[in-house]
Amino acid sequence: VLLQELDLFLFNEGSHRRLWEFLGAHVRSEGGVQFAVWAPNATEVHVVGDWNGWGEGTRLTAQSASGLWAGVVPDAAEGHCYKYAVTSRGGRSVLKADPMARWSECPPSTASRVAAPSRHDWGDTDWMTSRSNAPGSPLRVYEVHLGSWRPWLRDYRSIAHELADHVAGMGFTHVELMPLAEHPFGGSWGYQVTGYYSPTARFGGPDDMRALVDILHQRGIGVLMDWVPAHFPKDEWSLARFDGTALYEHADPRQGEHPDWGTYVFNYGRHEVRNFLVANALYWMEEFHIDGLRVDAVASMLYLDYSRPHDGWVPNEHGGRENLDAIDFLRQLNTVVADEFPTAMMLAEESTAWPKVTHPVEFGGLGFTHKWNMGWMHDTLDYMRTDPVHRKWHHRSLSFGLLYAFSERFVLPLSHDEVVHGKGSLLAKMPGDDWQRFANLRALYAWTWAMPGA
């Protein structure tokens, strides 16, 4: 028996909290590697890889009616690259990366790699036992894009030491890292994830990323991660149409495709898909000691008509625009995370006025611990870019945020969203000559520090 009955039951129920411990590739103590993958509509699944020069694959065996396929490859070993050859009902076979891979080839290569159990010896016990997400806990977050922050630093360990010195010297309490999960284009924010369980290989292996988090923790710096459960790319070798059908996504493009980003939207109504995402959140916290997740694009998950034409979406069962499955998923996610990691932070990037984002689930909320205050960022920067001569007509841009400042547990972001697409740096947004720009920037920072919110 390759997979235990309890694992199969919990997976199909959508409640397995340790998916990575039985799905994917696992090195066996007696030799070889066991592979397991979910592809319920496939007619055959083979695993191919380095062990035989990517020749004839090993056929996996269907595991009862669970939709899972599993098998052992005696010649496979740690570090080997592999893919699944998934044959659809139409007879077409496509090479797919492992959705549960815990290590990947460095892009632009796209194969998964066999990862061994971690050998990292954690030294952050003091941090892990003392961290807190309680109201009033200090929270000053420094957002970092690993690929562009110090481009000459090419690995997790080198980045860790210099980043720890910089952040500690600036008085920040946390870093928010982007991008961490594997993605195809290194020049991006990493929001088109192709390896949800795989730290990007651009900066080293999984244990190297563990070392990054460990070093920051030992310096008293928390680590948050940008996390993307809203959508995924259409690359054929990844999650898209994984077994020849819409498996992780909706079949109807009005529900399953995002028109702005050209990506697929997760099918939150499917137990296995929700399980894949919830377990992924737990994976980063357990295996990598991540202190919290900044959940990207929550607004796009909550509304069925988000960025869609009037005839380009499907109403819910009550005729409304709310995505009931996504709401249930977010509540399940935050409930499970709070149960497993009570001191973890869950931060929502939610750009509308959806009520009770940071209220407890039992009181009708979504259960996040924090919400990015996108409205405050827009209004404040709009005010600051106005010439001081004219600001007396625009004080409402500053005061309006105070009307709702205590309706949620807000984080005040000055983030990547405001520098992309030619928007320029914060300094470049300020009016006047260089002296005036720096003075205005100091005023902006002082206002941010004084405003209620983290």
Please state what every model-predicted region is.
Residues 1-34, 63-143, 148-154, 158:
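The feature marks proteins involved in alpha-glucan
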Residues 41-42, 146-149, 182, 229-230, ...:
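Short, solvent-exposed loop/turn segments at secondary-structure junctions
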Residues 45-47, 82:
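Short beta-strand elements bearing conserved aromatic residues within extracellular beta-rich modules
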Residues 53-59, 92-94:
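Surface-exposed loop/edge segments in extracytoplasmic proteins
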